[in-house]
Regions:
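Short alpha-helix in the alpha/beta-hydrolase fold that links the catalytic acid
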Residues: 256, 270-279
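Alpha/beta-hydrolase fold catalytic core
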Residues: 1-58, 81-84, 314-321
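Conserved HGGG/HGGXW glycine-rich cap/lid loop of the alpha/beta-hydrolase fold
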Residues: 48-98
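Flexible "cap/lid" loop of the alpha/beta hydrolase fold
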Residues: 141-148, 153-193
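Short beta-strand/loop motif that positions the catalytic acidic residue
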Residues: 254, 260-262, 266
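Active-site loop/oxyanion-hole signature of alpha/beta-hydrolase fold enzymes
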Residues: 34-37, 47, 77, 87-134, ...
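Conserved alpha/beta-hydrolase catalytic His-Asp/Glu region
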Residues: 19, 34, 169-177, 189-255
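Catalytic active-site module of serine/aspartate enzymes centered on a nucleophile-bearing elbow/loop
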Residues: 283-321
Length: 321
């Protein structure tokens, strides 16, 4: 009986309820696919309030992991009181689709950013309108690329959360060392196939990972099946598209106001990388470290995360008014 219990639909329900209560509604739009041939398209699923913006627009970009609704569920309520919040599923995640693997290369951060720019232009009342943007983890890579490519006239201010823009192969080796013995690759943990790998991912990503009695193997297998196994081929394809750490992803200062947010116990991207990212932006970015949180401070201490983010965004908006 226990093995038939699935928490995934329950978590989906509560996350969707937070979005609906914040006034956001699910929708989708078909757009030209940036890396496809003539006539290639992608379908982008997103959440946003209906109609044209009555408040300043804010784009929230999820990371490489569970659904966007899970990752931003604690933010949409407080943020929607001040901003027209737009939460897309990136290419290959959630309800967003792109051409088959055989027809197109895996989308890079640049491709993801170009798709988001096209989405913004396609939304009611958004063409050419300046939008604030925030991204977490992999979503921070995409947000940085979008801000740099679009420029400050289109995108800004910018929030980069738990996102090592300077990640290298040495960082991957450090990650495996922190994980302990028995792991041969980062992907083995980031795309878990067994309960032990899922438990290790939770341990590394969280300041207070759930105790083992609360994460029995049957429950973790269900999460693995629904979040990873059913989508494994696509997720592996997406990982191959990541260009951070290569000469295709060069970090240079951008003209927008930037807030960097990091958990002090992040074991995926350790805190020292936050200071390195800040230096790479000529030290002009503001850095906020949220204590007693790991890789997802927006979920582990949403009250603090939301205050830091709102203070920054509202001050930036006021200075532009």
């Amino acid at each position: 009986m226990g093995a038939s219990l699935s928490l995934v639909p329950v978590l989906d329900y509560f996350a969707r309820r937070e979005f609906l209560a914040a006034g956001l509604r699910p929708s989708a739009v078909t757009l030209p696919y940036p890396d496809g041939g003539a006539g290639a398209t992608c379908t982008v699923h997103y959440w946003a309030p209906p109609g044209e913006p009555r408040l300043p627009p804010l784009l929230l970009v999820h990371g490489f992991g569970p659904r966007a609704t899970w990752q931003w569920r604690c933010q949409v309520g407080p943020l929607s009181r001040h901003f027209h919040v737009i939460v897309p599923d990136l290419l290959g995640f959630g309800g967003t689709t792109y051409p088959s693997h055989a027809a197109a290369p895996p989308p890079s951060e640049a491709t993801q950013a170009a798709t988001l720019a096209a989405l913004l232009d396609a939304l009611p009342g958004m063409e050419g309108k300046r939008v604030a943007a925030a991204g977490t983890s992999y979503g921070g890579f995409v947000t940085y690329w979008l801000a740099r490519a679009a420029g400050s006239g289109r995108v800004g201010p910018v929030v980069i959360a738990s996102s090592d823009l300077l990640k290298t192969a040495a960082d991957d080796r450090g990650f495996l060392k922190r994980a302990g013995e028995g792991w041969s690759s980062v992907d083995e943990i980031l795309l878990p196939a067994e309960p032990a790998a899922m438990r290790k991912l939770l341990e590394l990503a969280s300041y207070r990972p759930p105790p083992r009695p609360m994460t029995p193997d049957f429950m973790l297998r269900d999460f693995i099946q629904k979040l990873f196994t059913e989508n494994r081929e696509r997720l592996v394809h997406l990982l191959k598209g990541i260009t951070v750490g290569t000469d295709k992803f060069e970090v240079t200062p951008i003209s927008q106001d930037v807030l960097i947010v990091w958990g002090d116990h992040d074991q995926l991207f350790p805190l020292e990388k936050a200071f390195a990212v800040q230096r790479s932006l000529n030290g002009s970015a503001r850095l906020e470290v949220i204590k007693k949180t790991g890789h997802a401070p927006q979920l582990e201490d949403p009250a603090r995360f939301n205050k830091v983010m709102l203070d920054f965004l509202l001050a930036a908006h006021k200075s532009q008014a």
